[in-house]
Amino acid sequence: MAKTLFEKVWEQHLVAEPANEPALLYIDLHLVHEVTSPQAFDGLRMTGRKLRRPDRTVATVDHNVPTIAADRLIIKDEIAARQIDALRRNCAEFGVELFDVQSREQGIVHVIGPELGLTKPGMTIVCGDSHTSTHGAFGALAFGIGTSEVEHVMATQCLPQGRPKTFRISVEGELPEGVTAKDIVLGIIGRIGTDGATGYVIEYAGSAIRSLSMEGRMTVCNMSIEAGARAGMIAPDETTFAYLKDREYSPKGKAWDEAVAAWSELKTDEGATFDRELVIPAIELTPYVTWGTNPGMVIPITDEIPGPETAASEADQRGIERALEYMGLKPGTPMEEVAIDVVFIGSCTNSRIEDLRAAAKVVTGYRVNEKVRAMVVPGSHRVKEQAEREGLDRIFREAGFEWREPGCSMCLGMNPDILTPGERCASTSNRNFEGRQGRGGRTHLVSPMMAAAAAITGHFSDIRTWEFKGEEVLA
């Protein structure tokens, strides 16, 4: 019987599938951070349980760690300091490997998992974070879980899960100039909506997806949850294997050859059926900018801010009216005329070396607009080190960007990097909800190249018409 990629991974991890009850899945890798783990560890302690598989549990600090070097030594925020200290104590007590603030391996959990080779094709991966779907770029079944589920996995290394439906989204053809992986996923969400994939696992396919680097594939899978999906997956191929080869936690020698042989079978069989399918011609995609308060409120850079009359229902009309009020925008305003105050390049969506190279290429030879505050936050220490070896930090600093230490930073208002009320930010992150980057902050989601261009011009700009200076620097 022909099977989809999802079905193969799901069935390989079934412990039990009783009738009329959730299935029980074995979990290969549990990623842990400081925010959603303290109560779970306390639950183990109170019930006298041990951590079932410390060898399949890895922790880091990322969500509320400061990104200014001096502030990382003594963390001023009381809640953040308590959470980080609790993670240190818990990892020491339960035997969990922790990549702490000063560790070379520290970084955003969804950046370090792949770069260390912890993430592998065919795995089941969970984390107490919505954007765990990032790891699906490797052909893993990866999804976020709540704190009670974190404790369940810690205690049993298994998790009850209802079987989701399958949804294949194929992007076919060559991507137009200036269109990136971020634009692919924003374009998808714009088409199907923020609930368009609720109850599904998405498999991304098609020639445009296959042409992406692993960094690009991670960006696409990262935002699957923003379309309502439980997870997003891409079949592993030679691009995947080349990325994983020789990484710290990847198999070596004969074990590598055996792993690649097994991973090569993780693809949807010809004739396998999906519950739903969508084909998008790549030529229809464009650089996008979100204008509202969810990722589905997105338009091409050349469009105008929509008005309530464009809504398909009364509920949607009210949503547009509320979003326009919160965002301080008027219908009919060209997106390219919307001025910004802050630029944030970072997050688990777009903080990898490829993202920083793309942004640096845009800003080379330019200066940040005098009215804009701009920062670049690498996703991990290793990304930061690589960028500094390539001189990207110098390019950003000379242009007027702040060059920060690794962490989740301005993606969410849980650390010192926040917007003030009314500030408007061009952000490479994944969510633009009300208050996401700080109370009253206004978030617009864009690609790294689009964010970099906005930092220079002071407003949203079409990257397709950008005049690049000094491309040879990054050749």
UniProtKB/Swiss-Prot annotation:
CDD domains (UniProt xref): IPMI
Catalytic activity: (2R,3S)-3-isopropylmalate = (2S)-2-isopropylmalate
GO annotation, biological process: L-leucine biosynthetic process
InterPro entries registered for this protein in UniProt: 3-IsopropMal_deHydase_lsu, Acnase/IPM_dHydase_lsu_aba_1/3, Acoase/IPM_deHydtase_lsu_aba, Aconitase_4Fe-4S_BS, Aconitase_4Fe-4S_dom, IPM_dehydratase_rel_enz, IPMI_cat
EC number, UniProt record: 4.2.1.33
Required cofactor(s): [4Fe-4S] cluster
Enzyme class: lyase
Annotated residues for binding of [4Fe-4S] cluster: 348, 408, 411
GO molecular function: 3-isopropylmalate dehydratase activity; 4 iron, 4 sulfur cluster binding; metal ion binding
Keywords, sorted A to Z: 4Fe-4S, Amino-acid biosynthesis, Branched-chain amino acid biosynthesis, Iron, Iron-sulfur, Leucine biosynthesis, Lyase, Metal-binding
Family: Belongs to the aconitase/IPM isomerase family. LeuC type 1 subfamily.
Free-text function comment from the UniProt entry: Catalyzes the isomerization between 2-isopropylmalate and 3-isopropylmalate, via the formation of 2-isopropylmaleate.
PANTHER family in alphabetical order: 3-ISOPROPYLMALATE DEHYDRATASE, HOMOACONITASE, MITOCHONDRIAL-RELATED
Record-given protein name: 3-isopropylmalate dehydratase large subunit
Species name: Acidobacterium capsulatum (strain ATCC 51196 / DSM 11244 / BCRC 80197 / JCM 7670 / NBRC 15755 / NCIMB 13165 / 161)
Lineage: Bacteria, Pseudomonadati, Acidobacteriota, Terriglobia, Terriglobales
Gene coding for it: leuC
